[in-house]
């Protein structure tokens, strides 16, 4: 079964690059969102298996969005995980992937898919 993923980031260039990378590695990227409101709408409409959420969504917080999402959430950022250790521990996120290390294998491992 192919994993279905929604990616949430306020940077369109990153969204396009991440989609291309993950689709080349066999992930079905079912949607892209640049705001929390758009992400919530798309999650309900598309029912992805996992949602990748940027920690900093412009003026919005990816952690606040993670609390509102119903599915599996993995946080992403260009910044190091140690900067967000407390927030990550308190969030419902299944894990964290630095944007530079984003891959289908990392996503599948954190989402609990073998």
Segments (PLM) and residue ranges:
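C-terminal output helix
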Residues: 83, 100-111
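The feature encodes the CheY-like receiver
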Residues: 58, 81
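Acidic catalytic/metal-coordinating carboxylates
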Residues: 35-38, 61-64
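As written
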Residues: 88-95
């Amino acid at each position: 079964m192919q994993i279905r993923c929604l990616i949430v980031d306020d940077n369109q260039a990153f969204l396009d690059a991440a989609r291309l990378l993950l689709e080349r590695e066999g992930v079905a990227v079912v949607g892209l969102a640049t705001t929390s409101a758009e992400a919530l709408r798309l999650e309900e409409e598309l029912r992805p298996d996992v949602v990748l959420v940027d920690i900093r969504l412009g003026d919005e917080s990816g952690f606040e969005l993670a609390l509102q999402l119903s599915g599996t959430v993995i946080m992403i950022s260009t910044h190091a995980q140690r900067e967000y250790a407390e927030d990550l521990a308190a969030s419902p996120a299944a894990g964290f992937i630095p944007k530079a290390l984003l891959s289908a294998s990392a996503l599948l491992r954190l989402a609990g898919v073998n």
